[in-house]
Amino acid sequence: MTQKEFNFSIYNTKFYGQYWQAKETSAVIVLAHGMGEHSNRYQHVAKKLTEHNFSAVAFDHFGHGKTEGKRGHNPSFEAVLESISKVIEKAKEFFPNKPLFLYGHSMGGNAVINYTIRKNHQLAGTIATSPFLKLAFKPPAIKLFVGKMLQNIVPSLTMGNELDVQAISREKEEVKKYIEDPLVHAKISPN
């Protein structure tokens, strides 16, 4: 397995990306991470994929990991979908004429499902694990009202995402790594 880094820019933001190349690539999987995470947290997934002749391409979303920007903020959901388009372009550049799959987890799962529905560019398939399709709880009406107001007034305002870190995995070591990872954050913006 060979690992390489790359960058691209959209919305005046420099994105960090990386890819893992299998010895013989049969297909490519573009990975979209979850809220507060970054692409490096999926190295173990990339390793397993390359062992089965799948190369993997991943990137850090707006305001995540090594990508520039305020932690937890993105300009818009459309901008998130455009960033996925850019990574797909990069994947096609690195691995021409190979079948391409999208894989997303949690927030990334929501993004890849929406991308597939709205912009499917000849994808071989889409995989989503624990996709964020709706909130796990119903927030108070006042919180929803204030959130919608803030989205129009101060869209880049970030606040805690209220994620229960203990619930991200049943493996205590995985939870510990998540908590201790300096590139993981617990921020979210109204956008």
Please give the residue ranges for each predicted region.
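Catalytic nucleophile-loop/oxyanion-hole region of alpha/beta-hydrolase
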Residues: 36-39, 65-95, 99
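The conserved beta1-alpha1 loop
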Residues: 30-34, 105
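Alpha/beta-hydrolase-fold enzymes
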Residues: 107-189
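Active-site glycine-rich loops that stabilize anionic/oxyanionic intermediates
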Residues: 26, 34-37
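N-terminal cap/lid segment of alpha/beta-hydrolase-fold proteins
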Residues: 1-24
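Conserved alpha/beta-hydrolase
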Residues: 41, 46-70
